[in-house]
A protein has these predicted regions:
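Generic structural motif
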Residues: 33, 129-132, 182
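Secondary-structure boundary/capping signal
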Residues: 26, 78, 181-182
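Amphipathic interaction/junction segments at domain boundaries or subunit interfaces
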Residues: 69-157
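C-terminal non-catalytic interaction appendages of large macromolecular assemblies
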Residues: 139-142, 148-202
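Hydrophobic, Leu/Ile/Phe/Ala-enriched alpha-helical segments that form helix-helix packing faces
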Residues: 18, 70, 122, 170-173, ...
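N-terminal, charged low-complexity regulatory/assembly segments
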Residues: 1-70
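Short amphipathic alpha-helical segments
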Residues: 58, 62, 78, 162-166
Length: 202
């Protein structure tokens, strides 16, 4: 199994959304085309650093490959709905697991504290982001993203509208967690100059 096939195998919710709309033969053919498109992108961007490739290979390039392939066949509007529905269903599933975890004693405080080291490692300069980090306050974490590889590479690949979906996924994951409030006033994907991120205990 190739690298692109392994990645696409993990995108079952996207395939299911396509299957709901199209005959199986057509869905399977488009999925194969998207897989091949992903392989091309992997080769084209093979020199990207490891931290950045975590985002491009697991999220950005598969989404672009699926969306652009669908767009050519079923049109932009329907392709966008497929991507939005599958992404938000994935985010909702993550939120459900997170809610269960946060109901355990002490987990809300630990969750907030974990964000500083987590974002610096996974969403810092080594992963293609540019950030403004704010001083830590008890029970609160704040950070701004002023440059984002999702916005950059989706735009470069001709599908900047997908960035908005990625921004929306955060709202689905963090927007209704027990004992925590997620605050955001703007995102790069929605035309803002930054993605401001604040999560705090309430």
């Amino acid at each position: 199994m190739t690298s692109s096939q392994k990645i696409m195998k993990k995108k079952g919710r996207f395939k299911a959304e396509i299957d709901r709309r199209l005959p199986k033969a057509q869905s399977d053919a488009l999925w194969q085309m998207a897989t091949e498109r992903l392989a091309v992108l992997q080769e084209q961007y093979s020199s990207l650093p490891e931290g950045l490739r975590f985002h491009t290979e697991n999220k950005i390039f598969p989404a672009a490959a699926i969306y652009l392939t669908l767009k050519e066949s079923i049109g932009q509007s329907e392709a966008y709905r497929v991507m939005e529905n599958a992404t938000f269903k994935t985010a909702d599933a993550a939120a459900k697991k997170l809610k269960a975890l946060l109901r355990l004693p002490g987990m809300r405080s630990l969750f907030v504290k974990a964000w500083d080291p987590l974002t610096r490692k996974m969403f810092g300069e080594n992963s293609g982001f540019q950030n403004v980090f704010y001083p830590n306050k008890k029970g609160e974490y704040r950070m701004d993203v002023v440059s984002c590889p999702y916005n950059r590479y989706f735009t470069e690949l001709g599908c900047p509208e997908l960035t908005k979906i990625s921004c929306g996924a955060d709202d689905h994951v963090y927007g209704d967690l027990p004992g925590l409030k997620f605050e955001r006033t703007s995102t790069l994907g929605r035309g803002g100059k930054r993605c401001d991120f604040c999560i705090r205990k309430v």
